[in-house]
Amino acid sequence: MSSAPAIHAVPEPSSGTVISFDGTTIHYDLYDAPSPSMVLVIPGFWRDRKHPSMVNLAHLLHADGYRTAIMDPRGHGESEGTFGFNANEHYDVDAVARRLLETSTISSITLIGFSYGGAIAISTAARHELPIASLLLISPVADFAMITPKINPLTIHRHIAMSNALHRPRIAWGVRKLQKIRAVDDIVKVRVPKCFIHVKNDWLIHHGHSVALYEAASEPKELHVLDIEGNYHSDRIFHVASDAIEPLMRDFLARYTPR
């Protein structure tokens, strides 16, 4: 990911917590700015708000003038609970969004979701009455049943760091298939602008997920399948192909997220 301009001072984030519908404590960080809207980032599976890729994204967004918040999905980072692969996580996003609306001057929120965070963003917009301005979805999951990773033992080190083993998420293995919400079903209820970004032949979540979501979604919508070498997934794209993804993100946010 490209770095923010040296002249821009990024403030230390303020941390907050909310209590979700079932008593689960959810943590988030806020990088404040005087913008009339908020960008709320939902990391993907095995990522939390303190991961370098998420911190770098917050700095990039803040340098562009966006008030930015990043949350720990349940079962990740400091948040309590266990991760259910889009079972109850949308309640957590709703709780964070409502707290931010109550404690700031913002009038709208753009959700940026990575991987399973993209699915959760879709379900949040579909199932809760929030002033959502737009959805920016990077390598989003359409349906758990569609996940078929293509693992190459010769290149897997490019995608998964050994340090991941030290920060394992807590998973709700008992969540049945029927309890996992299919984002491809919820997307039809979302009327705000939507942007889908995916690397062609993503090794973990095939770009067919974004295609399926795009085809089911209503206008306004846009789909960008990046034909770049490496089959990279989610936030890793910012590290290896920032020149390809950052202009797409900036253009979409400039059109739909006031600052």
Regions found by a protein language model. Name each.
Residues 190, 196-198, 202:
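Short beta-strand/loop motif that positions the catalytic acidic residue
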Residues 229-243:
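Catalytic histidine-centered segment of alpha/beta-hydrolase-like enzymes
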Residues 203-209:
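Conserved alpha/beta-hydrolase "acid-adjacent" motif
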Residues 74-104:
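Catalytic nucleophile-loop/oxyanion-hole region of alpha/beta-hydrolase
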Residues 46-59:
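The serine-hydrolase catalytic nucleophile loop
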Residues 126-176:
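Hydrolase active-site cap/lid region
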Residues 2-32:
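N-terminal cap/lid segment of alpha/beta-hydrolase-fold proteins
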Residues 58-80:
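Conserved alpha/beta-hydrolase
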